[in-house]
Amino acid sequence: MTKTGILKPKSVAETHQLMKVALGEEKADLTVVNAKVVNVYTGEILSDLGIAVKGKWIAYVGQKAGDSIGPQTEVIDAKGQTIIPGLIDGHTHIAWLFTPAEFLKYAICGGTTTVVTETLEPYFVCGYDGIIDFLESLRDQPIKFLATAPAMVSISRTAREMSLEILAKLLARDDILGLGESYWQVILQEPAQILPRFEQALAAGKTLEGHSAGAGDKKLAAYVAGGISSCHEPINAAQVLERLRMGLHIMVREGSIRRDLAEIAKIKDTGID
């Protein structure tokens, strides 16, 4: 089993250290003071807060972050600024148009700290080794890169040649979160070919990313029954609502390929939470 360590949880020692920083018994490596903080759990914007960081973990958010400041602590005065959680780009194709280095120039400036990319493109060109080389190129970057394994569900017949053995090797990696987008038409037309891949991914505790453009009502329901968890294809509020009612997580595209935000944003006027 191949592991990358990219999602390695806190150790007992790290957790104990964070507790000490939160209690003011140990000093932070970095403390941000005088900030407004967006709390995405409560929907509040809280004023005059501080954030204490130890290593790569946040230990404390509150009004007594000053207790964590020591002689070696880096202090940032964020007066007049607002801190939000880092943004996650949940679906993209890094290998399609640009290199990771070029992508980072723009992603970081927009507040993106984590990216989930498809890996279909390097597989077409170089197979399994191409995916591994691509994933290695995404390590040790200023932000976190995660990926999905090729679902091998495409309108192209040549794109359906990955064995279940290779898929299992990819799913064993902790930087592979699940299967990439799967076109609904192929799944409904060739369930015997595709559903074993879905079963394999779900058994590994991974997700199934969706591509449901053009599906609705019974066909959409049949697609969701396969275990699909998300979709980035809706282009208006009605399509978003239909998918939300079936339990899908929806991502909105706003970029060089599609600009759907204005239409989808109309859902806020429907009273839907």
Residue ranges and their predicted role:
Residues T2-A22, E26-K27, L104-G205:
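Divalent-metal coordination cores built from histidine and acidic residues
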Residues G5-T31, K36-I84:
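Histidine-rich, glycine-flanked metal-binding segment
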Residues L30, T73-E74, Q81, I143, ...:
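A structural micro-motif
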Residues A35, I51, K56, G80, ...:
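Divalent metal-coordination and catalytic microenvironments
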Residues Q63-K64, H93, T119-P122, P150-A151, ...:
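Short, ordered loop/turn segments at secondary-structure junctions
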Residues Q81-F103:
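Di-metal (Zn2+ and/or Mg2+/Mn2+) metal-binding site signature of metallo-dependent hydrolases
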Residues G86-I94, V115-T117, F145-A149, L177-E181, ...:
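Hydrophobic faces of well-ordered beta-strands that scaffold small-molecule active sites
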Residues M162-G178, V186-D273:
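Histidine/acidic residue-rich metal-binding segments in metalloenzymes
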